[in-house]
């Protein structure tokens, strides 16, 4: 694929599943990006990418990261592989956009922070609802102090997430499955924006009540901010 004279970010895609299809309109609609390569284990899917985008595809991320046209990598692989794939991209000197969750353990998340700092690359985690217009408007109203100081945020959210068609790993907590990894990141992202600070403590409970889909299907959490 030829790169235009306009400065663009050559984006390599790691994972061509649902997350990628949701992000695709954004990528192709923004002339600051060009899709230059992809990787997925499925050969047939790689062939479709080659045809649709006139760009190469690779059987693994290590091979993709050798492509000189790749400036940054969008990681949309299953949750359990995020740590491995972030490390590969970072050590290859590629900037990274990774879908939430960042990792499936605190240890992995901290290791990712250390790795990207050591490698001198930028990393962004993918929750996006804090950019929704109503959320941004609410943040503006809070920041204006027109209605007084913020005392408490109550957020309630319900979907049929657990009962949609799911791959096996999406129903296995040890592999990053369940609503905490897949859904809670959105609510925490929004609440942190509205609260305008860092969280100092978390108290939480989870519910795992369906033996047929034995992962967390519900949760509640109380988050306390440093500023009170």
Where are these regions (language model features)?
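N-terminal Rossmann-like dinucleotide-binding module
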Residues: 1-52
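Hydrophobic residues in well-ordered beta-strands that form the structural core
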Residues: 13, 59, 98, 123-125, ...
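Beta-loop-alpha module in the N-terminal Rossmann-like domain of NAD(P)-dependent dehydrogenases
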Residues: 53-115
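Rossmann-fold dehydrogenase core element
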Residues: 111-128, 148-153
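Short, Asp-centered acidic motifs that coordinate Mg2+ and/or phosphate
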Residues: 37, 72, 152
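Predominantly a Rossmann-like dinucleotide-binding segment in NAD(P)-dependent oxidoreductases
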Residues: 129-213, 219-222
